[in-house]
Amino acid sequence: MAEQLACLVSDMEPGTARLAELTDASGANVAVAVIRSDDGDFYAIGDECTHGEVSLAEGDVKGCLVECWAHGSRFDVRTGEPDEFPAITPVKTYPVRIDGERVLVDVDAPKTIQKENA
């Protein structure tokens, strides 16, 4: 599959998150947290906190971070990297494209994190 409709721009105010149930090319369901940052940009990440089985779409959005409501782990929605313990594993991030009013997400093309060698 390619890009899929996750929501409409008008469905989300800045600083909010919502769950989108999408389907990958194999037919598997993929739960995605669509995030609209405080500055109005859209991001898509795997919905499940990597510390526990908790929906990140139910978390608080502050800037480009979403905080898991259960244990306080925070993730940078641009990279998926955890910003606060107890989570240490990043969440998947997915490409987002805005087409007019439509927020499109491609769950078959997760972004990869480029880390610099220390």
Label each PLM-derived region with a short phrase.
Residues G63-W69, P82-V91:
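Short cysteine/histidine-rich metal-coordination sites, predominantly Zn2+-binding motifs
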Residues C49, C68-H71:
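Short cysteine clusters
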Residues M1-G63, T93-A118:
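N-terminal pre-ligand scaffold of iron-sulfur
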Residues S55-K62, S73-E84:
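Iron-sulfur (Fe-S) cluster-binding segments and ferredoxin-like electron-carrier domains
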Residues D24, G72-S73:
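A short alpha-helix capping/helix-coil boundary motif
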